[in-house]
Every structure is written in structure tokens, then in C-alpha cells.
């Protein structure tokens, strides 16, 4: 799903009611699925957590405690985050798993109307066990932005910075601490000062945080483009600490829409286009040329576009001496396609055709994702989806795609997790 938090911002509950944003609705929780027979041991590199009401409790400086974002419940309308006086409804797409598809909507729900694994780490582990997921890398909910954009948008910069740090503390101290080998630690960045951003990466790396979620296209969220040198301290810190940069589709707060009249399903069909465009920008901004050990992962990207893109990158090299094009590539040893294959990883939950040509893509750069608990999620049928896509591949490729590549990338001790 795409981060579209701005659409739910309103001033009062009454305005919600007037707009008709909250209506009578069914609230059904499905029974637990039967535990799957595990054939594929999956590391999911793209799931989401819906943050609990206690997110900021005890984690902000005393002078900011009274301004802390908090949950406000309004019966029967739902639970809302109040952030600097603005109410954000918890759209139920943030917790669709375990609920009937015909009840999904953008309307706010209450925590107790959601499957507990959506926000409780112990129950998340149980839901992972039901589907054969041995480890999970998460992103924030849409409330805070898949790349933590909400913190940079807070009017009080000091409060935004403190909340960003508190969020990262919660991930380490509560979410990941429940089982650090399975709930892989992540962090959100600070966008307004790259020295602070670098220090935060270093602070978190020192306590075992493996990755940082970042915007696929920061220019679209009001920040300098990837072609500026603004981001250098942040990228340097990520490279030096081995912190993986995770780029989720929609983390630029937009998805592809061919025209103003395009229906929503057109954008859904084009989800992979965001990652395709972003990957080319990250490549030709030459970020991985300047930082050759940087690890960049695209989440919810799909892999179907990769054969075409790799072919095209190789083809356009024939024009490198064409003076009118003024090629900007500076690496004298590696061509763009070589750097692309070296520094980028891509994730998918459903690309059966592309898996037929995975060796041309490079199996070592393909990762699996489950996207729990979003509407696109393949939970609980993770094993079935894997079997329909992977059963015809060799065991070394299956093992690499389902868990081996992710284990190497995020330093996950999978040998202790596969039973």
C-alpha cells in the first residue's frame, strides 16, 4: 500500500462525521488460520507495524511530554493519533490481515478491532510461525510514513526530532527486543540535518540496528534531490556502519498515476514503476559509485521489470561516446549495469513469470516479502504462494531467494531459525 497519510488529516471528529468519512461498518476478525506445512523458510523483507498507543511514553524529554502525540479514542468512530493538534485516523488498510476483504476500507478502526499481531510483537511472532516466516524486516505504518516522513513534517522541529529518536528507541527496546533474531531492527531517519542523520545512524548501528527506511525520491517530499551533495554524510554513515537503506514504494508520498483521470487500479497496477524510476535515479546520481559498499533495497518493487531494465542499461552504453548526449557517468572501471547489479536488491511477493527468468535477473539480488498486514499481503498463504512461483527452481536458488539473500544482507542467523 502507499503512504497517503495526508488524506486523513482533519481538525475535529465532527468534521470527519460531516465529510461522511466514518460510517457504520462491519468489524469482523477471522479465526486463526491453520498452521502451514512449512516447505519454504521465508525471511520477509517488507512487513509493517502499526505502532501501539504507548509509542512515545517515557521516551521524550520532560519539556516535550505534554506535546507528545497520543491516541484519542472516539466511540464508535475509531482510534486517532493526535499529532500537534491534528487528528490522524488509523485507516484500516494499516491492519487488513485477518479481516474479510469485503470489510476493508479507508475508515479508522480501533486497536481491538484489528488482529493483535498487527501491533503486538509477541503476537506478530505467532502469526509468522503460522505461515513459515522465520524473520521479518518491518516498515512504519502509514501514520508515520513508510520512510518516517511525518516526523520531518511536524511544525515543531525539536518535537519532530525528539519523536523520531523516540520512535527508533521503541523499535529497539520493545519491537525488536522481543526477539532480535526474528524481528529485525529498523530505524527512521532525520531529513532536515544530515549531520544529525548520520549521528542517528551511528547511534543505532552501535546497538545492532540493521537498516534505515528512507524515501525513494526525497525531492518529492520537499527535500534536495539525490543529485545534490546534501545527503553525503548520511550515505557515508550508512556505508561505514553497514546499515542497509530500505526504499519502500510510495515513500515519496506518491505513486505512479498516468493521468489525472486514471482510476485507482491503474496506480495499483503500476506499483513497480515507482521502484524502476527510483532505481535509475539512485544509479545515475552515482550514489553507489561514491559509496561502493552501500546496500540499497527496494521494497514492494516487484522484479518483472528488471530484465527489460538490465537490457536497456547495457544497450545505452553504446551511446557513451555520442557527444550530444553528454554522458555523466564517472566510473572508469564499472558500467552502470555492473553497479546496478552490485548495489541494488529488489523484493517481490508475486512475480511468477519473472521467476522463470530469474537467472538472467541475478537470483542473488532477489528477496521475498509478505507485506503483512497490508491488503496486498500474501499472509497466511505464504507457503502456497511460494510453491506456485518457486517449485520449479533449483534448491540453491530457492534457498537464496526465500532466506539466504536476506540473511546475508541483514546479518540474520537463519541457521538458528530453521527447524
Could you say what each language-model-derived stretch is?
Residues 145-149, 253-262, 377-379:
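Short acidic/His/Gly/Ser-rich catalytic and metal-binding motifs that mark active-site loops
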Residues 51, 139, 215:
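Conserved residues at the C-terminal ends of beta-strands
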Residues 47-48, 371-372:
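Active-site metal-binding loops of divalent metal-dependent hydrolases
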Residues 3, 159-162, 175-176, 181-184, ...:
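Catalytic pocket-lining loop regions of alpha/beta-barrel enzymes
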Residues 139-144, 249-254, 372-374:
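Short glycine-enriched loops at secondary-structure junctions
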Residues 111-116, 134-153, 180-189:
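Short, well-structured secondary-structure segments
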Residues 2-41, 57-107, 112-115, 119-135, ...:
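Mid-to-C-terminal alpha-helical segments outside catalytic/metal-binding sites
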Amino acid at each position: 500500500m502507499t503512504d497517503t497519510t495526508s488524506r486523513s488529516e482533519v481538525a475535529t471528529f465532527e468534521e470527519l462525521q460531516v465529510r461522511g468519512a466514518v460510517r457504520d461498518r462491519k468489524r469482523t476478525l477471522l479465526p486463526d488460520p491453520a498452521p502451514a506445512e512449512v516447505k519454504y523458510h521465508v525471511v520477509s523483507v517488507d512487513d509493517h507495524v502499526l505502532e501501539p498507543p504507548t509509542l512515545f511514553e517515557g521516551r521524550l524529554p520532560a519539556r516535550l511530554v505534554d506535546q507528545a502525540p497520543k491516541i484519542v479514542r472516539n466511540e464508535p468512530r475509531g482510534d486517532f493519533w493526535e499529532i500537534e493538534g491534528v487528528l490522524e485516523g488509523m485507516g484500516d488498510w494499516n491492519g487488513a490481515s485477518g479481516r474479510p476483504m469485503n470489510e476493508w476500507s479507508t475508515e479508522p478502526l480501533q486497536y481491538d478491532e484489528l488482529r493483535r499481531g498487527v501491533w503486538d510483537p509477541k503476537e506478530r511472532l505467532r502469526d509468522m510461525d503460522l505461515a513459515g516466516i522465520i524473520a521479518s524486516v518491518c516498515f512504519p505504518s502509514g501514520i508515520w510514513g513508510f520512510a518516517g516522513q511525518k516526523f520531518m513534517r511536524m511544525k515543531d522541529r525539536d518535537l519532530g526530532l525528539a519523536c523520531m529518536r523516540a520512535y527508533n528507541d521503541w523499535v529497539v527496546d520493545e519491537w525488536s527486543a522481543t526477539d532480535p533474531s526474528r524481528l529485525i531492527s529498523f530505524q527512521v531517519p532525520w531529513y532536515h540535518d544530515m549531520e544529525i542523520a548520520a549521528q542517528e545512524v551511528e547511534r543505532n548501528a552501535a546497538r545492532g540496528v540493521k537498516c534505515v527506511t528512507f524515501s525513494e525520491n526525497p525531492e518529492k517530499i520537499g527535500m534536495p534531490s539525490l543529485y545534490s551533495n546534501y545527503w553525503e554524510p548520511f550515505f557515508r554513515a550508512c556505508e561505514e556502519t553497514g546499515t542497509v537503506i530500505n526504499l519502500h514504494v510510495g515513500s515519496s508520498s506518491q505513486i505512479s498515476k498516468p493521468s489525472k483521470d486514471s482510476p485507482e487500479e491503474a496506480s495499483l497496477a503500476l506499483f513497480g514503476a515507482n521502484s524502476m524510476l527510483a532505481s535509475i535515479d539512485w544509479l545515475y546520481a552515482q550514489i553507489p559509485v561514491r559509496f561502493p559498499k552501500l546496500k540499497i533495497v527496494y521494497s514492494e518493487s516487484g522484479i518483472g521489470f528488471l530484465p527489460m531494465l538490465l537490457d536497456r542499461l547495457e544497450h545505452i552504453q553504446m551511446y557513451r561516446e555520442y557527444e550530444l548526449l553528454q554522458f555523466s557517468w564517472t566510473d572508469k572501471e564499472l558500467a552502470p549495469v555492473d553497479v546496478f547489479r552490485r548495489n541494488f536488491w529488489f523484493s517481490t511477493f508475486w512475480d511468477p513469470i519473472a521467476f522463470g527468468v530469474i537467472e538472467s535477473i541475478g537470483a542473488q539480488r532477489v528477496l521475498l516479502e509478505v507485506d503483512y498486514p497490508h491488503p496486498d499481503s500474501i499472509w497466511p498463504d505464504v507457503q502456497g504462494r511460494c510453491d506456485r512461483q518457486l517449485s520449479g527452481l533449483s534448491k540453491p536458488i530457492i534457498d537464496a531467494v526465500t532466506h539466504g539473500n536476506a540473511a546475508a544482507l541483514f546479518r540474520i542467523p537463519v541457521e538458528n531459525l530453521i527447524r
